[in-house]
């Protein structure tokens, strides 16, 4: 039987495979013959006639090299050894059966199982897993069915679709029902995720609030430490000045020492004839302005973390309309004045009144705070300077008030009067008395102070010597400008001043440059070296109430309800905008311009995007309850905004 099967083989070779095959590799003669035929056909194809391809010689050489390499015994052993390893053996796991069984039957400890949270959801874990799977397969099958249905239409002739079998409809219904249930599971999962996100956001807001409170406490503690350190430094300086044996030059202030050398040299002969040197040295020297630098290790940053328009603090500062406010830096020291004839010093960090500045005989109309120096201009026609670093608090026993004032303090209804029942003594420096009418505007920088008065004059003061060095007549300058002629670039407005407005509404100086806004709507730029008007800016149709300039622009506010931005390089209007009511106060920083425009909110203008928005208590006021009072004065520094209202309230905002 085996012999007959061997004879029937077309190749004449035996097809009977020994257990180990040829060469012990499991290969049969049929496999070798098939391999030889494939090699022959491939070689014949590659090494065809040389006329068909120019690369035939290269193919012939390559195949000869391959044939020579395959005839080597080492190469044959390597090729035949690969047949002993099946693909299953190559990818088979190296783990033993014992290891696999051990891992399969491993269980979790009871401690971990006890920590599994209880789920109140009505959906199982498997349903949630199925809900997260995409339904692409359903969409593909649905498209295939619809495409097949469309192919049944031939030549554009619509035929009635054959009715589906009930079993198919039931399958479709079950499939749609299952997908609808999965949609419910997915909606529940989305709702849970949204709820978790809301909880995380609420927790973050609470954490941010806690950190802000901590930052506020740190800044308050920092302010107290700096205040105590400043007091100790001042006491040490006072002790050194009062200690006997120190040089006589110590009794003379350092700020006025160099400035008075020329004066002493000129009047030395008169001093010798007037009195002896020993008697002259025993005379008490008047107080001089001593600018002590405030020790500030770091600037407050709390207001930078509030959103714009957020209220920081509100204080009932006065009992009447606020006429002037100013502060040195955010959360620092504020000085406010009102029609109640008081000037109060406040700690913006704690909102506490530190005391009164007493000395004026009438209400203060204007003031400025620069470091520890305060300048106040009053309706009594005087300008007084104060040094807050010398302040010493004493009870206010000489107050002039109503007979029932003490009863109000005992009741505690007026909180700020209890906290502010002290006077700041020893901080008065000197008074500048030369005007004959109320002082309506002032500004000082360095050792120069400019004051404007209702007597229609501007006066330049030397703060070192405490005397007036120059008087500028505004009416004379206006008359001189009107007689120059019609060929001048800047013409006088020709309008009469408003009787209800201040003749000098605002002033600002920088070195030898002075800007002054008056009741005739003119903005005059003076040169203090010559005492002449360098340029006049015409554009406003009402009295100027406020102005401020920097290196490039000058911003002015007027009772004509407009704010104008001037280009100092060209002398022309750069930008302008108006509000519904007259502008009473204005100030700007690097980002925004704020203004008080006769409303219960502060008008804010963003320089970058030219956006207008409101800030103040009037935004959140209830229509039923009483509305906040009108804002009269505004001050802005480094995004920290102060507003003074008509009812005596002063509030701090982020801007």
From Swiss-Prot:
Matching InterPro entries: G-protein_beta_WD-40_rep, WD40/YVTN_repeat-like_dom_sf, WD40_repeat_CS, WD40_repeat_dom_sf, WD40_rpt
Coiled coil: 199-244
Record-linked Pfam families: WD40
One of the record's GO cellular component terms: mitochondrial outer membrane
Region of interest: Disordered: 1-22, 134-170, 240-263
Keywords from the named record: Coiled coil, Membrane, Mitochondrion, Mitochondrion outer membrane, Repeat, WD repeat
Intervals holding WD repeats: 317-358, 359-396, 434-473, 479-536, 539-578, 580-615, 626-655
Membrane-topology descriptor: Peripheral membrane protein
Signal sequence coordinates: none
Subcellular location: Mitochondrion outer membrane
Family: Belongs to the WD repeat MDV1/CAF4 family.
Described function: Involved in mitochondrial fission. Acts as an adapter protein required to form mitochondrial fission complexes. Formation of these complexes is required to promote constriction and fission of the mitochondrial compartment at a late step in mitochondrial division.
Name under which the protein is recorded: Mitochondrial division protein 1
Organism expressing this protein natively: Aspergillus clavatus (strain ATCC 1007 / CBS 513.65 / DSM 816 / NCTC 3887 / NRRL 1 / QM 1276 / 107)
Name of the gene encoding the protein in the UniProt record: mdv1
